[in-house]
């Protein structure tokens, strides 16, 4: 199905083609290419507003995920009942925030890919609210990014690295 990447900000230039290519690979690795996915790139003001409304945190952040399917357990695939259910949800990338926290030695597109992969794991039920949940999420991210690295040659590390 489709991967839609929308850039709703003008602060940071976004190269959508490489991001799309990498996220299509991530979707293949995870086995979710038959599901629609939205990735929306926003600035600090917008991501802060969304974070305030949905998480009661009035600060910008790197990624927010909104799953189409509720109550998925870590690693479960959605069980669509109709064609309209073939949707994973939307990932909002705070691209300005991500750029501000990107190290000089890091490739910005790689960091966007890692962050979007983290968001996609959330859409598949992974969380990091406890050490046990974090370990599952970290392992999943690591597995996916290692496989992606084989295709791209990049050395990608999970976003959730070092949370616990």
UniProtKB/Swiss-Prot annotation:
Binds 1 zinc ion. Its EC number is 3.1.-.-. It is an enzyme of class 3 (hydrolase). GO terms for cellular component: mitochondrion; nucleus. GO terms for biological process: rRNA processing. PROSITE patterns: UPF0054. GO terms for molecular function: metal ion binding; metalloendopeptidase activity; RNA endonuclease activity. Its cofactor is Zn(2+). Keywords: Endonuclease, Hydrolase, Metal-binding, Nuclease, Zinc. SUPFAM superfamilies: Metalloproteases ('zincins'), catalytic domain (SSF55486). Zn(2+) binds at residues 118, 122, 128. InterPro entries: MetalPrtase_cat_dom_sf_prd, YbeY, YbeY_CS. Gene3D superfamilies: Metalloproteases ('zincins'), catalytic domain. Belongs to the endoribonuclease YbeY family. Single strand-specific metallo-endoribonuclease involved in rRNA maturation. PANTHER family: ENDORIBONUCLEASE YBEY, CHLOROPLASTIC. This is Endoribonuclease YbeY. The gene is Ybey.
């Amino acid at each position: 199905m489709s991967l839609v990447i929308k850039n709703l900000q003008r602060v940071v230039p976004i190269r959508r083609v490489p991001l799309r290519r990498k996220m299509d690979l991530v979707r293949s690795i995870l086995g979710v290419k038959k599901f629609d996915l939205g990735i929306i790139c926003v600035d600090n003001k917008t991501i802060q507003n969304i974070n305030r409304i949905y998480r009661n945190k009035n600060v910008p952040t790197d990624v927010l995920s909104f799953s189409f399917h509720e109550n998925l357990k870590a690693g479960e695939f959605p069980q669509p009942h109709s064609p309209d259910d073939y949707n994973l949800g939307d990932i909002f990338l705070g691209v300005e925030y991500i750029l501000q926290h990107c190290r000089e030695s890091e490739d910005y597109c790689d960091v966007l890919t890692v962050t979007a992969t983290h968001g996609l794991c959330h859409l598949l039920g992974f969380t990091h609210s406890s050490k046990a949940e974090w370990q599952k999420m970290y392992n999943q991210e690591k597995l996916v990014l290692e496989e992606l690295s084989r295709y791209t040659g990049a050395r990608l590390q999970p976003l959730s690295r070092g949370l616990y």
